[in-house]
Curated annotation (Swiss-Prot):
The keyword Transcription does not apply. Residues 583-640 are annotated as: Integrase-type zinc finger-like. The record marks H401, N402, N582, N583, A1217, A1218 as: Cleavage. Residues 1338-1476 form the Reverse transcriptase Ty1/copia-type domain. Residues 299-401 are annotated as: RNA-binding. One of its GO terms (molecular function) is RNA-directed DNA polymerase activity. It catalyses: DNA(n) + a 2'-deoxyribonucleoside 5'-triphosphate = DNA(n+1) + diphosphate; Endonucleolytic cleavage to 5'-phosphomonoester. Mg(2+) 3 binds at D1610, E1652, D1685. Residues 363-372, 1038-1053 have a biased composition (Basic and acidic residues). Residues 1-31, 46-60, 137-168, 373-411, 1005-1015, 1054-1082, 1095-1106 have a biased composition (Polar residues). Residues 660-835 form the Integrase catalytic domain. The lineage of its organism: Eukaryota, Fungi, Dikarya, Ascomycota, Saccharomycotina. This is Transposon Ty1-MR1 Gag-Pol polyprotein. Mg(2+) 2 binds at D1346, D1427, D1428. It comes from Saccharomyces cerevisiae (strain ATCC 204508 / S288c).
């Protein structure tokens, strides 16, 4: 480094040693405005660093360290005594007024002496303001006075820096605008440079060349104030001056930074694009340069990703480095670090090759001549710490233990180097220690110290003013190309590649950082004691340690050779992986692979694994010796630290100190468990536990929720309890970081009570082990107690409380005492404790009647907290009581599901006592449990509901046990108890295995069959399907409780005098077992047909022949015979072959008539006069009288493992109440939420399609100007009623496209925000079917259209606001709606009014009265369904004209123009239609069903024999009360909704033959018994098997140009609950079935005729409405017909005799029918029952009959 000699005018005071080696920042002439922006961030600290590190002496002044002090004391700044500045001066009032700055009010505010004006600066009129310099002052301004203690520069330097006194400095202009401040600063800096003050301005190194004096600072302040008036300063300048009005340097630094930041980005990008590297400069410097540019761009908001950065770097590689372009060209995941690693490897290899060549050229003797000393050409100067020792040192290197630096950098005081015992050093030159240079550049002399190098250590150098290091591995925050010139003792430049920080981690676990320079051209790594002293670290060579001023030892010092060293192990490595470049020659001729390179290449494996693999030759091409393992031990891979980061292990025993520090009940642990799902509202869902640290005493409290007030109540209770009961105050409560503990309410409560909350650390649950383990123990006890007792799940907290009582009384193995003993309480009296769930009899002290029993069976739970009684659960009353009036049942089973309490009491009065509590669940609770809570996209924190498939999988973990007992005979014991509540045993059936738990592909084909012998003797059994039928068995056994049904009476023979209603015999459910299902012949089957006895109101004419049509002539019209025949002529009625009369055998004639009044819900129309009634027999015809059932599904036990869990709360569901509670079929959600479609969607392809649809929807919303984008509203300013939540829904359309829709949450819309009177209309399905039928008959063209985003075309009138879509990131703002967003209550009505107005006014259409969304004119008919349009016209051009007009206003898409004469396929509102104009039309849903049914998770049977009918006749739905666990009940109801919802959609579209089965099962959605679910599965299986069936229409060929509209009616009398009949109607237009209806009668019918009248009366209004629609669409005459198979009904309709009206209800209906028949010209005709196709709408039919009635119109 450059030598600095002491001036002759500067005496050596204070015994300061001279500097032997220093570094000097050479002053440059570079304009400070041209420095890089990245190099100016420290410019702000220039003024704070001025003199901050320089010792203050009486001979040298310094700026106070706290320069931000508002009023520094003048006494702290000594004034010069004999210098050229004799007096202190402040700005006067006149000067202040001119500059605009306020006058200093106190001398202490301006303590610095005024900087007198230089004679070179003579502005006009300024002579009176500033005192001139004395004439004898001939040095420049930075030259201090001799008394200042500083040295004058030599004459040469003074001469070069002086400016002639004859020249005038041009003053800067006065600032006139804040916008011109930066330009003014440029001129002001030039002014300072011309005034010889340029060296105090920060340069490119971010530091000034020298420190300013007090006088210079005063001059700076005065000139700045004079030429920059305060009113024109920018705000940021005023902010700086408000803190310290003298900090002008900070203002100049920031100004320079701001000026350079404008052009720095362009320069960086240009530099990055024009990179060039060929190995001529060190790779470290190249990497530092590029890294610096990338970091700077990233900080300025211009991020450059790895791929682009690597392309820039590779483009600039040349020479030997060029091949890296090709080697890395195809690398996909390439990073800048990897690329620079390869560059470093190549550079190191080049340097190694050069050093090897140099070694061969030089002899070993020459190498020994390398020395750290050079020839002394100046007079040696002795610098000693001990003057008593002679100067006997020889010419050698300066030792690092007794020299210090003396330069502009701050140096240590003499006391920093303590007690050296070495001899004084004789330096032959001013600087005797060099920093090293490249050995190839020059030859140096060497002393006799040849072995003075210690690897892995830093050389301590007291003469070096800077720390230098050869490896960039330890440099932090490196920046390249520093403007620093460093020279050695021979004044040779040492190139510096980078500057950064060197970070130490010493023994006292402290970290320290100093500045470091990087250069590979030195022989040793030098550590400057001067820079260590600046951070309060000194070297004590008596102790050989580095220590702080307070004596703290930081690191040992090692003396090796003649030098002192410090180990590099205290250095912290940086994240720059750069190979160390050393210029010391190596004796190795081969290059080793660095371990970091091998570590990264071998997937970041550890060193031990890599070495073991190389030893065993599992990796070839190189050996273990080819790797440099020196850095493997202490190597830290940052990527491994990040990628393999793990949690620390919990420290065991960390809580032991608390046990000794706190008294009992002062330190508590608490935690919350929950929630427990599927519990009644009265049962708690959570519990909170407390544990005392010292005594381990536990408390538990129930919680229904985790709200703040609930938690606060518990804390208040527990604190009061401890304070009053134990006279203790809680000091600390340890808890986790749940929101229930970290909320502000609880925090304030604890703070108010002086309690310290102690929270667990993140991801360290074991730190909360006391509370966590307690909860786990209590839950284990809870599950065990519930399993042992068999009690329902809603009593779970009682089990928790029982366990807590016991656990507090058990001794701990460690303390040998129980928690109660530690707390000073007495032991638990076990005589007062009962086993949990112990059966007891509780005294009923308040019975309803004196004759009622006084004892109620119950179960003991736990001792009462509030009394001396016991808490007992009473199942019959469904409540718990606190009582002492109980008796323990000795020797009885303790399991709820094994103990028969009804058998114990033997008194039916108890059942009557508790009967009122067995009511069916309220309809509002059912509705609430079945609602699907769909949250908006903005409420992602809320719970996400399970997908139906996931829910089914979750619930499929439980299996109910199987009653595998063989059928038993009916004994007297089985008759004795008729109302016993039978519960399935809780034990796991041994027959259950994996094969019968998992869903089976086949169901058992053998149902439960009644006893054959008893059946043959006249006894009849009702089919009771067992709760579980193992799927591995071929036969199912009769349930053990089948004989206990209250409706069953066993008898050996049938009595003619029997008056009780008897159940209709049940046909078997099919099978192949010859022992249970004997084969029958057709002759025997025919004998089973029994004619029902005539009703009292049945006309005798019904016994007439059934093979001809009887025309009925009304009073108003007397059509001819051919009119009635023409009505029936074209109908798709079955063709019946003639049948000879069959006489019944004597045995059949002796059978009594079957009572038709059934109280059971049935799928068979047994009570109807037109039904086929069958009885059990040994032989039957499978084809005629029953439906084939090939699979016996166990509806909930096939996938349930619930029997392995504790018993749960159960619901008792009554059939009648469940049927009455069903109002409508709840639609099943078919759409996906945002999280389901995108966030958690694992199907990548589908996810991408949904994302594309999402962006498409957003663009459409913006295009349609759905909301006001000009203003966003604060949520707090808007009425919450007008704020509508929004969400995105996604679905996949039938054509395979994915669609997203932004919708409003209309389900939670406030009623005040819409008009409830507005209606959203869509086309009626009958209107669509009618239009299609007329189109076929008239050869119409059918065109299908779609209007995109239809609702958004309708304006919204109300003031509504929504939250913006999620992608806008504005969750706290609101936007006002301008258009009718999908989902709003009024959107549909708004769109309907908009499109209706347009079609009428612009397209010339008229809406058909009474039929909304049906528009017509003379040429075109339009059916509108929201945004879908179907156009019908004779001429295709008419459709095109309508389309052109629609496109003028709406975004109209043509789905199918329909211009082809061949078969055209449509998808209209879910119907798959095949249409060939003028020939036929086929309507089906095969593709849709193929896609949807498998998603229902119904176990289909694709390989077995297909079902031939959707149901089986004569099968009753059991009325017995259904008892289910609550979660099972909800799951089954939800499953029924899905299945019936799909079946209903299909049935009302075109499968009218299934409507009876769908309607009947829909009534039992809330009664999901095993039998009902089996029937539902059968229906879905039948739909699957017949999914290819279609509704077939052929073009009619009428004789006359008329339309014929016919309704066929039928009723099944009394086959529904409450004697309700089933009615059905089928509507036909020109012989084509266009609709059907099957429903339960709204009134109770007392006869078949009443049922038929009711059915006809329900069909006539729709018949008249359809007639009007047909006449409007097709201007032709119309003939209307009404067909029924009830002659008595026809006679009542056409008769004028009112005596037939037996009651007012049906009399009114009959009279209305008479009027309608006569007034509307209805032709009422009779049709044979066997040809009545409406028969399929009212009852289940045998296979043969079902096929016969449906195969002509659906196949």
């Amino acid at each position: 480094m450059e030598s600095q000699q002491l001036s002759q005018h500067s005496p050596i005071s204070h015994g300061s040693a001279c500097a032997s080696v220093t570094s000097k920042e050479v002053q440059t002439t570079q304009d400070p405005l041209d420095i890089s922006a990245s190099k100016t961030e420290e410019c702000e600290k220039v003024s704070t660093q001025a003199n901050s590190q320089q010792p203050t002496t009486p001979l040298s002044s310094a700026v106070p360290e706290n320069h931000h002090h508002a009023s520094p004391q003048a006494a702290q700044v000594p004034l010069p005594q004999n210098g050229p500045y004799p007096q202190q001066r402040m700005m006067n009032t006149q000067q202040a007024n001119i500059s605009g700055w306020p006058v200093y009010g106190h001398p202490s505010l301006m303590p610095y002496p005024p900087y007198q004006m230089s004679p070179m600066y003579a502005p006009p009129g300024a002579q009176s303001q500033f005192t001139q310099y004395p004439q004898y002052v001939g040095t420049h301004l930075n030259t201090p006075s001799p008394e200042s203690g500083n040295s004058f520069p030599d004459s040469s330097s003074a001469k070069s820096n002086m400016t002639s006194t004859n020249q005038h400095v041009r003053p800067p202009p006065i600032l006139t605008s804040p916008n011109d401040f930066l330009n003014w600063v440029k001129i002001y800096i030039k002014f300072l440079q011309n005034s010889n003050l340029g060296d105090i301005i920060p340069t490119a190194t971010r530091k000034a060349v020298r420190q300013m004096t007090d006088d210079e600072l005063t001059f700076l302040c005065h000139t700045f104030q004079l030429f920059a008036p305060s009113q024109f300063l920018p705000p940021w300048v005023k902010d700086i001056l408000s803190v310290d009005y003298t900090d002008i340097m900070k203002i100049l630094s920031k100004s320079i930074n701001k000026m350079q930041s404008d052009t720095q980005e362009v320069n960086d990008i240009t530099t990055l694009a024009t990179l060039h590297y060929n190995g001529s400069t060190p790779a470290d410097a190249f990497e530092a340069e590029v890294t610096n540019i990338l970091d700077r761009l990233n900080n300025n908001g211009i991020p450059i990703n790895n791929k682009v950065a690597c392309q820039f770097i590779m483009r600039g590689l040349s020479g030997e480095y060029k091949f890296l372009r090709y080697a890395r060209h195809r690398c996909i995941h390439m990073t800048v670090a990897d690329l620079f690693s390869d560059i470093h490897s190549m550079y190191e290899e080049q340097q190694e090759s050069k050093r090897n060549k140099s070694t061969h050229r030089r002899s070993p003797s020459d190498e020994k001549k390398d020395s750290r000393t050079y020839t002394n050409t100046t007079k040696p100067k002795s610098i000693t710490r001990n003057s008593q020792k002679p100067n006997n040192s020889q010419s050698r290197t300066a030792r690092a233990h007794n020299v210090s630096t003396f330069n502009n950098s701050p140096g240590p005081d003499n006391d920093l180097i303590r007690g050296s015992t070495t001899e004084p050093i004789q330096l032959k030159n001013t600087h005797d220690l060099h920093l090293g240079q490249e050995l190839t550049e020059s030859t140096v002399n060497h002393t006799n110290h040849s072995d003075d190098k210690l690897p892995g250590h830093l050389l301590l150098d007291s003469g070096a003013s800077r720390t230098l290091i050869r490896s960039a591995h330890h440099i932090h925050s490196a920046s390249s190309n520093p403007d620093i010139n460093v020279v050695d003792a021979q004044k040779r430049n040492i190139p510096i590649n980078a500057i950064g920080d060197l970070q130490f981690h010493f023994q006292d676990n402290t970290k320290t950082s100093i500045k470091v320079l990087h250069t590979p051209n030195i022989a040793y790594d030098l550590l400057s004691l001067n820079e260590l002293a600046a951070v309060d670290i000194t070297a004590c060579f008596t102790k050989n340690v580095l220590e702080r001023s307070d004596g703290t030892v930081l690191a040992p010092i090692v003396k090796y050779g003649d030098f002192y060293w410090v180990s590099k192990k205290y250095l912290l490595p940086s994240n720059i992986s750069v190979p160390t470049i050393n210029n010391v020659h190596t004796s190795e001729s081969t290059r080793k692979y660095p371990y970091p390179f091998i570590h990264r290449m071998l997937a970041h494996a550890n060193a031990q694994t890599i070495r073991y693999s190389l030893k065993n030759n599992t990796i070839t091409y190189f050996n273990e010796s080819d790797v440099d393992w020196s850095s493997a031990i202490d190597y830290q891979c940052p990527d491994c630290l990040i990628g393999k980061s793990t949690k620390h292990r919990h420290i065991k025993g960390s809580r032991l100190k608390y046990q000794n520090s706190y008294e009992p009940f002062q330190y508590l642990h608490t935690d919350i468990f929950g929630p427990v799902h599927n519990l009644p509202k009265s049962a708690p869902s959570y519990f909170i536990s407390f544990t005392d640290e010292t005594t381990k005493f536990r408390w538990v409290y129930p919680l229904h929720d985790r709200r703040e007030d609930s938690i606060l109540d518990v804390f208040t209770t527990i604190l009061a309890f401890i304070k009053n009961q134990f006279q203790a105050s809680v000091l600390v409560i340890q808890m986790d970081r749940g929101s229930e503990y970290t909320n502000r309410t609880l925090h304030k409560f604890l703070e108010k009570n002086g309690i310290t909350p102690c929270y667990t650390t993140t991801a360290d649950s074991r730190a909360h082990g006391v509370a966590e383990r307690l909860n786990r123990t209590l839950l284990d006890d809870c599950r065990t107690q519930l399993q042992c007792s068999g009690l329902p799940n809603h009593l779970w907290f009682s089990a928790i409380e029982f366990s807590t009582i016991v656990r507090n009384s058990l001794a701990s193995p460690k303390s040998k005492k129980s928690a109660r003993q530690h707390a000073g309480l007495a032991g638990l009296d076990i005589s007062t404790l009962l086993p949990f769930g112990q059966p007891v009899i509780v005294n009923d002290h308040n019975p309803n009647s004196k004759i009622h029993p006084r004892g109620i069976p119950g179960y003991a739970l736990h001792p009462s907290r509030n009394s001396y009684g016991y808490i007992i659960y009473l199942p019959s009353l469904k409540k718990t009581v606190d009582t002492t009036n109980y008796v323990i049942l000795q020797g009885k089973e303790s399991r709820l599901d094994q103990f028969n309490y009804d058998a114990l009491t033997f008194d039916e009065d108890l059942n009557r006592l508790t009967a009122s509590y067995h009511s069916f669940i309220a309809s509002n609770e059912i509705q609430q449990s079945n609602d699907l809570n769909i949250e908006s996209d903005h409420d992602f924190q809320s719970d996400i509901e399970l997908h139906p498939e996931q829910l089914r999988n979750v619930l499929s973990k439980a299996v109910s046990p199987t009653d595998s007992t063989p059928p038993s005979t009916h004994t007297e014991d089985s008759k004795r108890v008729s109302k016993t509540n039978i519960r399935a045993p809780r034990e796991v059936d041994p027959n259950i295995s994996e094969s019968n738990i998992l869903p089976s592909k086949k169901r058992s084909s053998t149902p439960q069959i009644s006893d054959i012998e008893s059946t043959g003797s006249g006894g009849m059994h009702r089919l009771d399907v067992p709760l579980l039928a193992p799927m591995s068995q071929s036969n199912t056994h009769e349930s053990s409780h089948a004989s206990k049904s209250k409706d069953f009476r066993h008898s050996d023979s049938y009595s003619d005098n029997e008056t009780n209603h008897t159940n209709v015999p049940i046909s078997s459910t099919g099978g192949t077992n010859n022992k249970t299902v004997p084969q029958t012949s057709e002759q025997e089957t025919e004998k089973r047909i029994i004619h029902r006895s005539p009703s009292i109101d049945t006309s005798s004419s019904e016994s007439n022949s059934l093979h001809h049509v009887v025309p009925i002539k009304t009073s108003d019209t007397c059509p001819k015979e051919n009119t009635e025949e023409s009505i029936i002529a074209d109908l798709p009625l079955p063709d019946l072959p003639p049948e000879p009369p069959t006489e019944l055998s004597d045995s059949f004639k002796e059978l009594p008539p079957i009572n038709s009044r059934q109280t059971n819900s049935s799928l068979g129309g047994i009570g109807d006069s037109n039904a086929y009634t069958t009885i059990n027999s040994k032989k039957r015809s499978l084809e005629d009288n029953e439906t084939e059932i090939k699979v016996s599904r166990d509806t909930w036990n096939t996938k349930n493992m619930r029997s392995l869990e504790p018993p749960r709360s159960k619901k008792r569901i009554h059939l009648i109440a469940a049927v009455k509670a069903v109002k409508s079929i709840k639609p099943i959600r078919t759409t996906l939420r945002y999280d389901e479609a995108i966030t958690y969607n694992k199907d990548i392809k589908e996810k991408e399609k949904y994302i594309e649809a999402y962006h498409k929807e957003v663009n459409q919303l913006l295009k349609m100007k759905t909301w006001d984008t000009d203003k966003y509203y604060d949520r707090k300013e808007i009425d919450p009623k007008r704020v509508i939540n929004s969400m995105f829904i996604f679905n996949r359309k039938r054509d395979g496209t994915h669609k997203a829709r932004f919708v409003a949450r209309g389900d939670i819309q406030h009623p005040d925000t819409y008009d409830s009177g507005m209606q959203s209309n869509t086309v009626h399905h009958y209107a669509l079917m009618t239009s299609l039928s007329l189109a076929l008959d008239n050869n119409y063209y059918i065109t299908q259209l779609d209007i995109s985003s239809a609702y958004l075309y309708a304006d919204i009138k109300e003031e509504l606001y929504i939250r913006p879509p999620p992608h806008l990131g504005m969750n706290d703002k609101l936007i006002r709606l301008k258009k009718s967003l999908y989902g709003l209550k009024q959107s549909g009505a708004n769109w309907y009014e908009t499109i209706k107005s347009y079609l009428i006014k612009q397209c010339g259409m008229e809406e058909v009265r009474g039929w909304s969304c049906v528009f017509e004119n003379s040429q075109v008919t339009i059916c509108l369904f929201v945004d879908d349009m179907v156009l019908f016209s004779k001429n295709l051009n008419s459709n095109k004209r309508i389309i052109d007009k629609l496109k003028m206003q709406y975004d109209t898409k043509i789905i199918n123009l329909g211009e082809s004469d061949e078969e055209i396929q449509y998808d209209i509102l879910g119907l798959e239609i095949k249409y060939q104009r003028g020939k036929y039309m086929k309507l089906g849903m095969e593709n849709s069903l193929t896609e949807k049914i498998p998603k229902l998770n119904v176990p289909l049977n694709p390989k077995g024999r297909k079902l031939s009918a959707p149901g089986q006749p004569g099968l009753y739905i059991d009325q017995q009360e259904l008892e289910l666990e609550e979660d099972d009940y909800k799951m089954k109801v939800h499953e029924m909704q899905k299945l019936i919802g799909l079946a209903s959609y299909v049935g009302y579209k075109f499968r009218f033959d299934l409507l009876y089965y769908i309607n009947t099962l829909a009534q039992h959605i809330l009664f999901p018994s095993k039998q009902v679910l089996d029937m539902t599965y059968e229906l879905i299986q039948f739909i699957w098997n017949t999914r290819d069936k279609q509704l077939i229409w052929h073009k009619s060929k009428p004789v006359k140009p008329t339309n014929k509209l016919v309704v066929i009616s039928d009723a099944s009398y009394g086959n529904q609950p409450y004697y309700k009949s089933q009615i059905g109607n089928i509507y036909l237009l020109n012989g084509k079935v266009i609709g059907g209806k099957s429903t339960k009668a709204s009134l109770t019918c007392t006869s078949t005729t009443e049922a038929e009248i009711h059915a006809i009366s329900e069909s006539v209004p729709l018949l008249n409405n359809l007639s009007y629609l047909i006449q409007e669409l097709d201007k032709k005459p119309i003939t209307k017909g009404l067909l029924t198979d009830s002659k008595s009904t026809i006679s009542i309709i056409i008769s004028n005799n009112e005596e037939k009206f037996r009651n007012r209800f049906f009399g009114t209906k009959a009279m209305r029918l008479r009027d309608e028949v006569s007034g509307n010209h209805l032709h009422v005709c009779y049709i044979e029952t066997k040809k009545n196709i409406a028969d399929v709408m009212t009852k289940p039919l045998p296979i043969k009959t079902f096929k016969l009635l449906t195969n002509k119109w659906i196949h």
